[in-house]
Regions:
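Transmembrane alpha-helices and adjacent helix-loop boundaries
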Residues: 14-483
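N-terminal acidic, proline/glycine-rich, low-complexity intrinsically disordered segments
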Residues: 1-14
Length: 483
């Protein structure tokens, strides 16, 4: 209810008198200093508060029969789950750390992890991890059959990629955009040269043909931008200009691959373990996102041909299991190749995984595009932005922000799906670990469990890291939207 304004002189005098009494220091109930800050109740702060809010809050309602029944039931469920969690955690720690065998100083190999019943020195009933087995097979699990003298190349590729990725992720560092651009363009070329040895035998004539083609396409794009052609031909010229820059980058990559770096050539059949897992996962992640964005835009396009082709592509790849794609790429594709043409097995798997993941990524991005209000499109048209300008500056940034969880979920699924390449003869991390189990020199009842534990921990580290970083990006972008 609104207060009435003070008009008369007597009313103003009464107010002044009241105020003078209120601020009189002789009045005992008037506080002259701020009240001290009291600590929060135990149920609201600290570890006790966390326990109450997340565990005990659902078990403290005994004011009614229904509330008491619910509290008792939730308490029973909490006790059962807590018991299961504690016992399984202790069992895992005992298997992996407390009771595990950590070294084999006498070189006994499998006998180092044998019990007395099996002819070893460990007590009867011992069942824990055999880490000497992992130490002996670490090179194959992490690098495959890559030559030992050339492992520095793999480690250098890991180091450069990790430093550049960390540089991009840490906000306080300068030149993050430049480092990010180099990570997406120059680093793949560097990693390919280091891992394969370079010198692919590409002729100068081939590079010249691509260079001339790129210059022609760029010239067409310039003509369209200058207004010499208009309408549909103008749009086609603009697309040709963009393709020209892509072709000239491809020509530059071919020029680098034609240089002899005096490195030993390593066939991809010698790659394996964690190296293969990272190559397949990173290639699929980096290539599937832009391809998925283009497919999502094509499916929502007003052009019937683009919409039809994008829809057919997405529905085809989503309707086929990944293992079928890998089998087709490894077994059936060579049958359709010309005589004498040999397509690298790993490259075939990379193409199949990328196309498969791009179809799922397209649907995730399309969901983000549908979440954008129509007014955003109308606002972009009102300020005179072209289709690609509105997509790049207004629509896509908002759409991708909305679907960060879906994008990262697809990335995590792709990372775990790399284990399927072992079925077609490519030894990824899981395949390499499984192949080491056939070594009779390390045949023990626990070598399989130890190997699978290592693989599970590695997969968990990468997947959990991606999940946490996506949560960080969500919080960061949410704060920027709410400001």
């Amino acid at each position: 209810m609104a207060k009435k304004p003070i008009k008369s002189a007597s009313q103003r005098a009464n107010v002044k008198k009241t105020l003078s009494v209120a601020v009189d220091p002789q009045v005992g109930f008037v506080r002259t200093e701020p009240a001290p800050l009291l600590p929060p109740p135990p149920s609201e702060g600290g570890f006790t508060g966390w326990l109450y809010k997340n565990i005990f809050a659902s078990m403290s309602d005994f004011g009614s029969f229904g509330g008491a029944t619910k509290s008792i039931f939730m308490g029973f469920v909490t006790l059962v789950l807590s018991y299961f969690l504690v016992t399984q955690t202790l069992a895992l720690l005992d298997f992996a750390i407390f009771s595990a065998v950590w070294s084999d100083p006498k070189g006994l190999e499998r006998e180092a992890c044998w019990t007395v019943e099996q002819g070893g020195a460990l007590p009867a009933g011992w069942h824990a991890a055999c880490w000497p087995f992992i130490q002996a097979k670490a090179k194959f699990i992490f690098y495959g059959a890559y030559p030992s003298d050339e492992l520095w190349r793999v480690n250098l590729a890991y180091l450069v990629g990790s430093v550049m990725l960390a540089w991009v992720m840490i906000e306080r560092l300068p030149y993050r955009k430049i480092v990010g651009a180099l990570l997406l363009t120059a680093y793949p070329v560097l990693a390919t040269v280091l891992l394969t040895g370079g010198a692919f035998g590409i002729s100068t004539g081939t590079i010249g043909v691509y260079t001339i083609l790129s210059l022609a396409l760029i010239t067409m794009g310039r003509l369209g931008k200058a207004g010499y052609v208009s309408g549909a031909l103008g749009d086609l010229a603009s697309v040709a200009g963009v393709c020209g820059w892509v072709v000239i980058l491809f020509a530059a990559v071919l020029a680098v691959f034609s240089v002899d770096f005096s490195l030993e050539a390593i066939d991809t059949r010698d790659w394996g373990g964690l190296l293969i897992t990272l190559v397949v996962a990173i290639t699929g992640i980096v290539a599937s996102l832009p391809l998925g964005i283009l497919l999502a835009l094509g499916r929502r396009s007003d052009m019937p041909v683009a919409r039809f082709l994008s829809t057919v592509f997405i529905e085809f790849w989503r309707g086929v299991p990944l293992i079928t794609v890998l089998f087709m790429a490894s077994v059936m594709l060579p049958l359709f190749m010309p005589e004498g043409v040999n397509f690298d097995m790993l490259l075939r798997a990379l193409i199949g995984v990328t196309l498969f993941s791009a179809a799922y990524m397209a649907e995730v991005v399309r969901g983000g595009l549908q979440a954008i209000d129509k007014g955003q499109y109308e606002g972009a048209d009102a300020v005179g932005l072209s289709y690609w300008q509105s997509m790049r500056l207004i629509i896509l940034p908002q759409a991708l922000t909305h679907v960060i969880p879906g994008i990262v979920n697809t990335f995590i699924g792709l990372f775990k799906d790399t284990a399927l390449v072992s079925i077609v003869g490519i030894f990824d991390l899981l395949g390499a670990a499984q192949s080491t189990l056939a070594d009779a020199a390390w045949s023990t009842p626990v070598q399989g469990l130890t190997g699978y534990l290592v693989v599970a921990v590695i997969f968990f580290i990468f997947c959990f890291g991606m999940s946490r970083y996506s949560m960080f990006m969500e919080r960061k972008l949410s704060r920027s939207r709410n400001r």
